[in-house]
């Protein structure tokens, strides 16, 4: 992936994507990972994410998914099918608008939950994140920084830290997710 960030670093423009090894990649989970309780489907084609999900045997797995605008625009039907199978969607505000057509973040969060995942986080970069869940909304600030050089990978780091904290807590209740979100923001 290559792209450029706009002046405020909150929005980006994708300039080029080279799939390279992912063009013919077929992920195979090792037997020891098939019963994982915490699963993060990283940003790859939704068909590959579904292929990973198909290999899981743990019925109580807490499954989070990440994506980018490329998959929303080029593989939207596959991504919408995948959303019916996951517990936790974490995307940024421009991706949420692209997926739902809603520019209002509150309406977008509700619309995303209707697509399947019970829990949704919409990231707003330097402006924090919004966590949507049944009968609730939780807004949290971003970790304050005075100088931002390059936000590439910040969302991946955030979600990885959130899922790592949930796995360490071995819980997925709302309070634990809120705690993990604060942790992810600080990382």
Regions found by a protein language model. Give the residues of each.
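Conserved phosphate/ATP/ADP-binding segment of small-molecule kinases
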Residues: 54-62, 69-141
